[in-house]
Amino acid sequence: MRVTDFHFDLPDELIARYPTAERSASRLLYLNGNTGEYQDQQFNDLLEHIHSGDLLIFNNTRVIPARLYGRKASGGKLEVLVERVLDEHRCLAHIRSSKAPKENAEIFLGEDKLGEGNGFKAIMVARYDALFELKFEASQPLFDLLQQAGHMPLPPYIDRPDEDADQERYQTVYSKVLGAVAAPTAGLHFDHQMLQKLQEKGVQTAFVTLHVGAGTFQPVRVETIEEHKMHAEYAEVSQDVVDKILATKAQGKRVICVGTTSVRSIESAAQAAEKEGKLIAPFYSDTTIFLYPGKTFRIVDALVTNFHLPESTLIMLVSAFAGFKNCMNAYQHAVESQYRFFSYGDAMFITKNENALGDVP
């Protein structure tokens, strides 16, 4: 399969640069994976599609203010995007500057927020391809430094500086475990009122953790998708989640994932468990799972997700789940109907196409 098979033309004005006034005020495109039929709805209509006994799985990762602005000892400006916190004083990060810092170089960060002379220093101790290992020379833990001086790491396509409102709106209301540098965006549509209505309806909920990395925005740089190497992200699927999934399946109910990160967490756990002859087992590890047309979904029956970038691994995942033709037809309709795209945009609710394995480009 060629990466260009997953291309579609997207007018710039359909990229959502700000969220809707209310979380659940987005539009919803319902796509029946088996029939390919779609329907224009509002996000609150999701309640019609999720039934008592169904299990809704969320990703409870919390976005860290991972973007820092600073300077090298020479005075040259740079930008740091923390990818992964290693311990209280070390992290792996992307660095943008005119010239990459050398090993043992000093970097001064946080002065734009904390004031001249009140920033903090980091040492570049090692480089691993595109990532730099930084050691922070401050008494406070790294998470505290980021809370004080970091900026919300809005995706590049939002194309504006972060604002105070993003501190709240670029987090899900149920976010709990610090570690992501991008939000699991399908969850941004859920407010407390909607979660309450789902509970009253008898819908079960469970939470996985996958710390979304900056690699989620990296373009696929190969021509054929089978050559693509996925970036690693850390995921946790607990015994409690496994028990709920097994109970849901035993009752003939559906497992519904909120977001592609929840899908990748659950399907990673299922893939690992298959080697032990199990349907699913607890999972605490990095995952590089890549789901594209021709790949199997062992657990997930339905999916809530946003509209993704052309030629991205995420539209490939949706194509694998809904069927390639169904997915691309629905996306074409979304463009023509002026749905809002990407992180702050509208959502889809998709039921699994049981014949998707035969629908590849």
Swiss-Prot record:
GO terms for molecular function: S-adenosylmethionine:tRNA ribosyltransferase-isomerase activity. Keywords: Cytoplasm, Queuosine biosynthesis, S-adenosyl-L-methionine, Transferase. It catalyses: 7-aminomethyl-7-carbaguanosine(34) in tRNA + S-adenosyl-L-methionine = epoxyqueuosine(34) in tRNA + adenine + L-methionine + 2 H(+). Its EC number is 2.4.99.17. Its main location: cytoplasm. Gene3D superfamilies: QueA-like (3.40.1780.10). Monomer. NCBIfam families: PRK00147.1 (NF001140), queA (TIGR00113). This is S-adenosylmethionine:tRNA ribosyltransferase-isomerase. It comes from Glaesserella parasuis serovar 5 (strain SH0165).
